[in-house]
């Protein structure tokens, strides 16, 4: 199987420069990623995902540094015990946004049907994200509806069917959560990468 990428009608409207440092946006014709033969630095390449790196890394994330939404996992692989009383660490969505020079860019990760996204917090393996990813949407103006689910004022691009390309969901063959420290947890690499303004793990999974 392969992913389905859907671009909005306004996807190509952000090719200008932003902020006092003149950070480059993206050209719609470059899609998610277009190789620039003059560089091997991901954020210097062409396309939306490298531009996401450039903009999201320096954005102000105070409005939404990252949060779960939707139904919580009733039976997580890693039970948080006491730590679970300190917040919400699972859901069917994980979203974050950041504002830079008037561009309020964000992403929403949706769990695959019947799955949940989870964060282990201080339980072992600590600070690890797992769960099967179904889709990721990037957009502008992150909002929550009356049920607490995230959506965008303006969607830019959605990547669907991520659960069909062999990602491990952050779980090994024994059904155990793969520690983030191994570098082998696809879900953690993608979601935590996006949270930190690094879409290279997502592109590596797609490429």
Model-predicted regions and their roles:
Residues 1-207:
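RTX-like calcium-binding, glycine/aspartate-rich low-complexity repeat tracts
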């Amino acid at each position: 199987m392969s992913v389905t990428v859907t671009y909005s009608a306004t996807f190509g409207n952000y090719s200008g420069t932003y902020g006092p440092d003149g950070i480059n946006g993206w050209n719609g014709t470059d899609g998610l990623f277009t190789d620039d033969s003059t560089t091997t630095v991901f954020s210097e390449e062409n396309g939306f995902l490298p531009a996401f790196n450039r903009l999201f890394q320096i954005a102000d994330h105070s409005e939404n540094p990252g949060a779960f939404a939707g139904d919580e996992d009733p039976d997580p692989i890693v039970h948080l015990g006491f730590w679970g009383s300190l917040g919400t660490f699972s859901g069917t969505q994980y979203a974050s946004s950041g504002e830079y020079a008037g561009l309020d860019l964000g992403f929403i990760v949706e769990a695959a049907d019947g799955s949940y996204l989870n964060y282990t917090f201080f339980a072992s393996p600590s600070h690890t994200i797992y769960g099967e990813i179904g889709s990721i949407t990037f957009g502008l103006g992150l909002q929550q509806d009356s049920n607490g689910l995230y959506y965008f004022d303006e969607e830019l691009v959605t990547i669907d069917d991520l659960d069909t390309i062999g990602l491990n969901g952050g779980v090994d063959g024994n059904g155990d959560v793969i520690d983030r420290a191994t570098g082998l947890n696809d879900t953690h690499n993608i979601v935590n990468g996006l949270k930190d303004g690094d879409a290279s793990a997502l592109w590596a999974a797609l490429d």
